[in-house]
Amino acid sequence: MNLKNFENKLHTLAVFHSFYQSPLWVKLSAYFQSETEEELLQSYTDLCAYIYSQGGDLSKIVERFVLDDENYYQLLLHKESGKEDLIERSMIRELEILQQLHDLKGEMLFKDLSYPYELPSWSNHVADLKQMYQQRLENLNREGYGIFARYHMFQVDENGLVPIQYPDPQSLASMTGYEIQRNALIQNTLAFLKGMKANNALLYGDAGTGKSSTIKAIVNAYKDEGLRLIEVRKSQIQWLPSLIESLAENPLKFIIFIDDLSFQTGDPDFILMKTILEGGSVASLSNTIIYATSNRRHLMKESFDDRAGSDIHHNDTIQECASLASRFGLTITFSKPAKDLYFEIVKGYAKEYDLQLSDSELMIKAEAFALRNNGRSPRTARQFVEHQKIVESME
């Protein structure tokens, strides 16, 4: 390999232009710019150290970059207008260049050095980048690209989306009770994934009944079908229009998740939320849907002044709140479980944690735990079982 020609080729990436912001390019570029043998040795070992920090296989680093890159070609491919032949030819040419980098061995860089001792090197493996990338393009609506290919749950800050590195591992299989509520949300989500008409959903009910866990478990179950979750706090509602617009051309499906949604009288976000649910502030998009949870059926925190006002004012407030809740289209109620359901949930968790208690002992202890704490709920059931597992481990 002629290293100078290879270096020049690496300077011609347009589709994969973000390569020039990658740590790998920073290390390679330093090597190519080295003039003395000492500089070459230093930059070469810096490159090796970086590759080692990523697992020691240069091929895998290049593959991760190519498969996760978010570029203009993908956006064109997703648009109804289709892709441009000129850009496609550039993409193919650049993949051939990156294939050379994928296969680059350490000896190719240090073979002309006069250094007489052994130098570090890295691993490579055989793979066809063009074939791998074509498979990714064919599955964009399920696998996504960029950070959406690496993560499936996100939060929002002033700089944009922040991946959740360690998302809640809650699974549908581990959930007991509330089958009717859970199935209603699953069916709505499946319709959404299939591009059918689906409703924004409000999960209303007592604290600890599994509203948020249900949403996260559904996303975990269908992430491989292209489902992603973006958690937005109530204080960030003003960012929703721009967030939804930014997702407009993304091939994946997004649940905008707002936990513990509620408003106070005169809250400016109340009107904005109502407008968003009506589709008035952003285009009607088929790839975003809003799922919210609340402990208040009509989403409004009622102050003492509200209750002390006139009946007309009080009724107007209730009607206004009800009008927002009705915009969700699908309202699912999660009530605190009765004793029998609570015990079924406890037994489900006890089996998962392999507790060594008879059913009668389990029921007595679980009921006592609920009385001492926050009453019967799926959350209380899990807390009891986790506590009991600790007790057993200490005996």
Which residue stretches match the model-derived regions?
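AAA+ P-loop ATPase mechanoenzymes
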Residues: M1-S174
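Walker A/P-loop nucleotide-binding motif
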Residues: Y178, G195-I215
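C-terminal alpha-helical "lid" subdomain
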Residues: S335-E395
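AAA+/P-loop NTPase substrate/partner-engagement loops
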Residues: A221-F254, S262-G266
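N-terminal pre-Walker A segment at the start of P-loop NTPase domains
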Residues: I164-L190
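Conserved P-loop NTPase mechanochemical-coupling segment
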Residues: P169-A173, S212-S235, K301-E302, M394
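Conserved catalytic/switch belt of AAA+ P-loop NTPases
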Residues: Q264-D311, D316
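Conserved AAA+ ATPase "SRH/arginine-finger" region at the nucleotide-binding site
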Residues: S310-A322, G329-L341
